[in-house]
Amino acid sequence: MINQANKTAKLRVKRAVRVRKHLRGTGLKPRLCVVKSNSHIQAQLIDDETGTTLGGTATFAKEYRNTEFCKKNKASARKLGEQIAEIAKSKNIKEVVFDRGPFKYHGILAELANAARAGGLQF
């Protein structure tokens, strides 16, 4: 049982590395990194050249506590996509590199990406 968990974790890291080795965020075109846990979603704009986070939001943020958007579902992903697009606009960012990590571009990730595109981000 433990060996299976270790194998799954290693495969997940391997997928993330495989995706991220092709992605590089800059100040003009940062990386939009999306992380999913068992209960939350998190999105960040990252400048890899300087190693800084330009902005981010998550379902566990104060503004989403005790609301319908504090859980990991498509409605929350849509709200986070809109929020991250607003953050990017405030920083004069129009283009990003989408980093899905080890996750498939499906369901919650696709919903977040579509909402970010609807908010004005291009990727």
UniProtKB/Swiss-Prot annotation:
Keywords, sorted A to Z: Ribonucleoprotein, Ribosomal protein, RNA-binding, rRNA-binding
Molecular function in Gene Ontology: 5S rRNA binding; structural constituent of ribosome
Superkingdom classification of source: Bacteria
BP term (GO), one: translation
UniProt cross-references to InterPro entries, sorted A to Z: Ribosomal_uL18_bac-type (IPR004389), Ribosomal_uL18_bac/euk (IPR005484)
Pfam families attached to this UniProt entry: Ribosomal_L18p (PF00861)
GO cellular component, one term: cytosolic large ribosomal subunit
CDD domains: Ribosomal_L18_L5e
Family: Belongs to the universal ribosomal protein uL18 family.
Functional description taken from the UniProt entry: This is one of the proteins that bind and probably mediate the attachment of the 5S RNA into the large ribosomal subunit, where it forms part of the central protuberance.
Entry-linked NCBIfam families: L18_bact (TIGR00060)
Subunit structure: Part of the 50S ribosomal subunit; part of the 5S rRNA/L5/L18/L25 subcomplex. Contacts the 5S and 23S rRNAs.
Protein name, per record: Large ribosomal subunit protein uL18
Organism, as annotated: Protochlamydia amoebophila (strain UWE25)
